[in-house]
Amino acid sequence: QLARPTVALITNAGEAHLAGLGSVAAVARAKGEIFSGLQHDGIAVINADDAYAGLWRQLAAPHRCLTFGMDHPADVSAECTLAITGSVVRLKTPQGEIDMRLSLLGKHNVMNALAAAGASIAAGVKLDDIRKGLEKLKAMSGRLEIKPGIRGARILDDTYNANPSSLVAGVE
C-alpha cells in the first residue's frame, strides 16, 4: 500500500513461485492481489491467454482492464512470423496497428513484447515509441542466443537458467 501504481501487469501464473504457496491457483490469486493496490483510475493489464485471466479480471474490478494475447481475443494482439533470425510482428491495439521486427526469438518473447506494449499503452505511450523501444531489444547472453557453428550451422544457446519450461519455449 506504500506505492499505488497507475498500471499493474500480470504476465502469467506458473510453477516458478510454488514454494510457500502450494499450487498454481494460489500463485494466481497472490499475483492478482496487486490489483487491489491500483489507484482508483488505474489500469490492470492481463494476459488473455493465461488460464487465470478470468480470475484476474474479477480481482481487478472495478478498474479498467487491458488484455494482451495471441491465442484468445485481446485488446493488444499480434500477427507474427517466427524465424531463427527473430520475429516480424504486426501489433494490433486499440490505438491502431503497427509493424515491427523483433530480434528476440520465440513466441514467448512475442508475448513478452505484447505485455510490454499493453503496459505502455496503459501508461499513455505512443505506438511509434513502443515500436522503437521493442525493436531495440537484444537477447541476453545464454537466452535463446544464436551462435555460429561449424560448416554454417547455428547453435541456439539457452543455457542461462535452463529448465524444462525454457526448453519448450525455445522449441516454440
Each model region followed by its residue ranges:
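Amphipathic, non-transmembrane alpha-helical secondary structure
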Residues: 1, 32, 36, 168-172
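Acidic, Mg2+-coordinating active-site environments of NTP-dependent enzymes
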Residues: 4-154
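AMP-binding/adenylate-forming catalytic core of the ANL superfamily
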Residues: 27, 161-172
